[in-house]
Regions:
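Catalytic core of carbohydrate-active enzymes
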Residues: 1-198, 202-203
């Protein structure tokens, strides 16, 4: 990678670390793909079939239900024109900047940053970055919570199995629900105490 220079090396490293941190999210949707045939990478109109604007979004996609990815596909481009469907969306890279949905917008897109957005009212399971999968078998799951507006809930059903054998074919797996409801008094967490986890709240927009 040094052949391409230090900047390219750092950008690739950052992208790989992002992938590793999202493994619990990716693995959950990989199981859904196995069970239901739904792809992890989804055209926008698959999640938003009644929004005609999504029919023209051929350079962005949903990654599961919660994340919207808009990769730069034009040489030397420094910005990205993209469409956000209904709802509110946070810039997943800074976890702070909030955008209203049902609009086209242009965002900065340096080589070091893939434009990514998470829908308000989502929960993203993540894990610490490792050198390889299985380096730390007893890793903590970190739930990133992007709370819904008052009166609504954010939820996720995390899927886990050993990942090293076919035990899942014999129902040797765990599905763990997490729900965070936004109330007038604050956030109410519903989570079964089946393992130690970390909850990280991102409160922009509520």
């Amino acid at each position: 990678m040094a052949f391409f220079g230090e900047e390219a090396e750092q950008n690739v490293k950052k992208a790989i670390e992002l992938k590793y941190s999202l493994i619990p999210y990716i693995y959950t949707y990989a199981r859904e793909a196995h069970d239901a045939g739904l792809p992890i990478m989804r055209p926008m109109f698959l999640e938003y079939p009644y929004d005609v604007e999504t029919f023209d979004t051929d350079a962005q996609f949903m990654f599961g239900k919660e994340l919207l990815i808009a990769p730069v596909v034009k040489k030397n481009a420094k910005t990205k024109n993209l469409y956000l469907p209904e709802g509110n969306w946070l810039n997943y890279n800074d976890k702070r900047t909030l955008y209203s949905g049902e609009q086209w917008l242009t965002v900065d897109a340096p080589l070091s940053c893939i434009p990514m957005f998470v829908k308000q009212g989502s929960i993203i399971p993540t894990m610490p970055v490792m050198n390889y999968i299985g380096e730390h078998p007893e890793y903590p799951v970190i739930f990133e919570v992007f709370p819904a507006v008052e009166g609504q809930s954010a939820s996720f059903l995390l899927y886990e199995d050993e990942g090293t054998d076919l035990g899942y074919l014999k129902d040797e797996f765990l599905k763990t629900p997490i729900n965070v409801k936004t109330t007038l008094k604050g956030l109410k967490l519903l989570f079964p105490h089946v393992r130690v986890v970390t909850i990280s709240y991102h409160l922009s927009g509520i």
